[in-house]
UniProtKB/Swiss-Prot annotation:
This is Immunoglobulin iota chain. The gene is VPREB1. One of its GO terms (biological process) is immune response. Only expressed by pre-B-cells. Pfam families: V-set.
Length: 145
């Protein structure tokens, strides 16, 4: 396998968090093809990530953003349509962080990745939100060139 870097640019969005930026992501990350990378989305300390779902989106060059996944807890999460299981979410409540892990990095993973925080919702509301987000997504963005 040849070594090729994958660069990730991170942007964040938080609904209902007020006018000040409350999320932080490193501006870019890179890793070799075939490896696993973990993107971090950190919520400011005066907010509690434990009460939010973490949403992740991907935008490839020349394409609109697409919903990847929502993660609230190991027992309360959802994957976007046709999103492979090598994309997975997690949270570290003690560090106030959400994570997106991408295993077996592939060339097509080069994209912008968006992180967003939102209130926990029911499965029905989640399906409706996914449909709306596919039509007009609102999320933070991370670029993987």
């Amino acid at each position: 396998m040849s070594w090729a870097p994958v660069l990730l640019m991170l942007f964040v969005y938080c609904t209902g968090c007020g006018p000040q930026p409350v999320l932080h992501q490193p501006p870019a990350m890179s890793s070799a093809l075939g490896t696993t990378i973990r993107l971090t989305c950190t919520l400011r300390n005066d907010h509690d990530i434990g009460v939010y779902s973490v949403y992740w989106y991907q935008q490839r060059p020349g394409h609109p953003p697409r919903f990847l996944l929502r993660y609230f807890s190991q027992s309360d999460k959802s994957q976007g349509p046709q999103v492979p299981p090598r994309f997975s979410g997690s949270k570290d409540v003690a560090r106030n962080r959400g994570y997106l892990s991408i295993s077996e990095l592939q060339p097509e993973d080069e994209a912008m990745y968006y992180c967003a925080m939102g209130a926990r919702s029911s499965e029905k509301e989640e399906r409706e939100r996914e449909w709306e987000e596919e039509m007009e997504p609102t999320a933070a963005r991370t670029r993987v060139p």
